Amino acid sequence: DGEIVGRICGIINQIAKEKKKNKKVRFGWFDFIDDFEVSSTLLNAVAEWGKSQGMEILNGPVGFTDFDHQGLLLEGFDYVAPMASLYNFPYYSTHYENLGLTKEADWIEYQVTVPTKVPEKMERVAQMILSRNKLRIDKVKNAKEIMKKYGYSYFDVIDAAYQPLYNFQPLTKEQKIYYSTLY
């Protein structure tokens, strides 16, 4: 009837496919009305496309990179979602189950009250760690100053820190350039 009832994006990370022999087709931006025919048609389209490209596993919801939103909200619908999180309607989880999708990892968010002053003991431990490891805190005003001072090596630190995280893929040079322009 010409009415938009859903959307989905299929993504193949060519670097992961070639270097790690990763056979996952990623899906994201998966939104749909509460109609199983719609959700199954959308997901099956990505699955079939992925198979035609040699992929064997559906992985999502994720984005183009690991810095994009990912995951499915399963509880906590009565709270305001943080800006860095995805939001979806409660019926999504039923659709995912009916589509045969299973949870592979848990992402848990907490609300933390930050104290107005750093506790004295924490300050002492921090100073001890800095001293022992010959580290320093470099104060910068903004992301542009970080880029000017450190260039793209800044992203090497991010890649190293994120490496142990679920499903992480290091950033390409092009992605580093792109993200450096956002801030």
Regions of interest found by a model, annotated:
Residues L86-N167:
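Acyltransferase donor/substrate-recognition loop-hinge adjacent to the catalytic core
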Residues Q163-T181:
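Conserved GNAT-fold acetyl-CoA-binding loop/helix
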Residues D1, T181-Y183:
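A short helix-loop-beta-strand connector motif used in the catalytic cores of GNAT acetyltransferases and
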Residues T41, A45, S153-A160, Y178:
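A non-catalytic, amphipathic alpha-helix used as a structural packing/dimerization or gating element
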Residues K19-G100, A105:
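Acyl-donor binding region in acyl/amide transferases
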Residues Q14, F64-D68, T116:
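Feature marks short, surface-exposed loop/turn motifs that line or immediately flank catalytic pockets
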Residues I11-Q14, W29-D31:
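Asp/Glu-centered strand-loop micro-motifs enriched in Gly/Pro and often flanked by an aromatic residue
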Residues E3-N13:
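Conserved beta-strand in the GNAT
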